[in-house]
UniProtKB/Swiss-Prot annotation:
This is 2-acylglycerol O-acyltransferase 1. It comes from Bos taurus (Bovine). The chain crosses the membrane at residues 24-44, 104-124. Keywords: Acyltransferase, Endoplasmic reticulum, Glycerol metabolism, Glycoprotein, Lipid biosynthesis, Lipid metabolism, Membrane, Transferase, Transmembrane, Transmembrane helix. It is found in: Endoplasmic reticulum membrane. GO terms for molecular function: 2-acylglycerol O-acyltransferase activity; diacylglycerol O-acyltransferase activity. Pathway: Glycerolipid metabolism; triacylglycerol biosynthesis.
Amino acid sequence: MKVEFAPLNIPLARRLQTAAVLHWLLSFLLFAQVCLGIIVFLIIYNYWFLYLPYLTWLYFDWQTPEQGGRRSEWVRNWAIWRYFKDYFPIHLIKTWDLDPSHNYIFGFHPHGVLVVGAFGNFCTNYSAFKELFPGFTSYLHVLPYWFRCPLFREYLMSSGPVSVSKKSVCHVLSKEGGGNISVIVLGGAEESLDAHPGKFTLFIRQRKGFVKIALTHGAYLVPVFSFGENELFKQVSNPEGSWLRNVQEKLQKIMGFALPLFHARGIFQYNFGLIPYRKPIHTVVGRPIPVRQTLNPTSEQIEELHQTYMEELRKLFEEHKGKYGIPENETLIFR
């Protein structure tokens, strides 16, 4: 295979964009382990005056990811996020005005390999979120285990993510007067194993917990589809029933997160590596589904609203797929 190297005369801005994406990628693939290693090092070599105050503070701060987190506008305004957004680039599209007197659940689809669109749009101040949705604060919910790693949790929370636990979602949606948006990647870890280019398989049929929470809090549901999310990486073929898929699913059940074997391009060449491809991401926010607060919803009410949500999600995909190069015969597959 002939290696295609990047030309030397690439503009500085594009180099900075690649560096920004590399920083983000390494943050999620390696930084947690580095932070854990730092704590272990401090304990082994008895730097008690460093680790003891932090671990004491950590004990009292443990619930913060379930209580709205601790975002930093300074971190969200870092210039590196502008280069990160422009690398793909990432776009946020609004199709309907939202009433800031309500709280909302944005159901984000698809998961993709690393949920790039969700981070770029809802965890930095360089997306069009503030202009499109004035009066709102968004909270991207991520797996709780990210917040169990000392030091890394502080870095992660500074961009705005909070835990995806029920307690955390309920906390966000309990704001009096509205104006909060819980962004939940509903397909979760399982869906990442089906994040192949040109494929649109969503794990949604058994995901009904978010519907019950929406009913109990009267939070409006909004389907969100991120066109281009599955085009950023290629995965090793892992069809249902294959030995690789079986291993991945078993590991996912044990660890709580999936391990897709993905690849894309490198820093200085285009043939192999872990840097995502430069593919545009268009995150389209659909029409809100009004939800009447029901403190003790029945299974029938949950099922009915869940069905309505899936219909609105499919409608959103069908209405916009042609704008983003998806063939007319392609459709969503709900699992």
